[in-house]
Amino acid sequence: MTKAPWVGARPPKPGGGLSSAFTSGRGRSFEDFYRAELPGLVVLARALAPPGLAEDVAQEAMMVAYRRWLTIRELAHPEAYVRRACTNLAVSQFRRHLSEARAFRRSGAPQTVEKLGGPDEFWHLVRTLPRRQRQVVALHYVFDLSVADVARTLEISEGSVKVHLSRARQTLARSMGLAVEVES
């Protein structure tokens, strides 16, 4: 996710960092728009997005507006545009969160993951796996693809998919303090 140049720092002074394309037109600069609308977007995102993601969703909505500011600033209600973008992004995050939760339930290890503190910690462990293992785990468990479908998607052999799944399961089991079952 890309962020505005001043995210995490003070925004530039009026006219001090944005090109004239972003400070002219209808008398409102993007900086003024950002300052006025961001707090409301965060509140909106908190109502719609999974916990802990509201600020990211609001920032991403502002990035959408920033990239299209030349067009958006000419709208009668640019704030409606950015609120809709925020709503769409929050719903997407919520759906992603639900997909992870469903995959977690299908994995057959909810009691084990609950010992870790919940699905967030489990998916944090998944993110520590090597890239190919992460891909295979996500496609197989989140998208519920068969081994053959995962192989076609990643353009690797079915045997490679099985090896990556097996290694990922073993690594995750060790990380969670479970007995590692060797698959034959």
Question: What is each model feature region?
Answer:
Residues 2-14, 19-43:
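A short, charge-rich alpha-helical start-of-domain segment used by transcription regulators
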Residues 51, 62-77, 92, 96-98, ...:
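Sigma70-family region 2
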Residues 70-73, 85-106, 115:
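Arg/Lys-rich amphipathic alpha helix in sigma70-family domain 2
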Residues 41, 45, 54-65, 85, ...:
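Short, small-hydrophobic-rich alpha-helical interface motif
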Residues 121-129:
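Short amphipathic alpha-helical boundary/capping segments
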Residues 87, 91, 154-178:
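DNA-recognition helix of helix-turn-helix
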Residues 23-32, 42-60, 69-76:
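Short, charged helix-capping/linker segments at alpha-helix termini
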Residues 136-140:
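A short pre-motif secondary-structure segment
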